[in-house]
């Protein structure tokens, strides 16, 4: 616990001291799309522990303002996205994949050609099927999806955020084939992959930057 707190404090201090990195908060998809958020200061980014993920689920990062409790509350419940220097994070509380919510806190974003991709826990039938443990019980419906997803709290897949609708779509094999259509060599390499996990998908998304 002390070690985790120390690391978090060091991370916060690094953000503050790194040339006063630009920190911008966005309250909705329109502001993010247009790049017209509000500039703030003294934000702190903490990587959430595996224990925290198992207890409450949600995104990998916690963003708060240690010197401003009301701002911290806003960041948690109402803020849509946060940009700190070149790093962008979206609030999982505001994200939706079909009818499923993605929990709280923040997910890191990979920006590729004006598109926004972020990593989060696999939820729903389309996402969980790709990562469900081999021995997981196969159940039907939402209950089955929830049970399967609960065993995947430390797993990540990519979602693509549509800022016009505010909806997210799972980035699976079919979507990656569309994105790689203009890169035949990359597409051939991708077709050999057997996983849709974030580490695999992300490898090819980064090559499109």
Q: PLM features: what roles do these ranges have?
A:
Residues 17-19, 29-31, 200-203:
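Generic hydrophobic/packing signal
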């Amino acid at each position: 616990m002390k070690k985790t707190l120390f690391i978090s404090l060091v991370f916060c201090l690094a953000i503050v001291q790194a040339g006063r990195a630009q920190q911008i908060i966005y309250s909705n998809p329109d502001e993010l799309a247009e790049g017209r958020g509000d500039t703030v200061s003294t934000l702190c980014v903490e990587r959430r522990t595996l224990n925290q993920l198992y207890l409450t689920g949600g995104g990998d990062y916690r963003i708060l303002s240690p010197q401003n409790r009301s701002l911290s509350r806003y960041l948690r419940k109402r803020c849509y996205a946060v940009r700190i220097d070149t790093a962008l994070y979206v609030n999982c509380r505001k994200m939706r994949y079909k009818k499923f919510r993605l929990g709280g806190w923040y997910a890191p974003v990979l920006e590729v050609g004006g598109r926004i991709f972020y990593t989060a826990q696999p939820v729903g039938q389309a996402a969980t099927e790709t990562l469900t443990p081999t021995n997981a019980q196969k159940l039907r419906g939402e209950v089955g999806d929830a049970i399967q997803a609960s065993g995947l709290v430390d797993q990540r897949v990519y979602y693509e955020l549509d800022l016009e609708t505010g909806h997210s779509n799972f980035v699976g094999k079919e979507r990656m084939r569309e994105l790689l259509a203009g890169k035949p060599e990359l597409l051939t390499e991708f077709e050999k992959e057997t996983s849709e996990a974030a580490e695999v998908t992300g490898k090819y998304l980064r090559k499109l930057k």
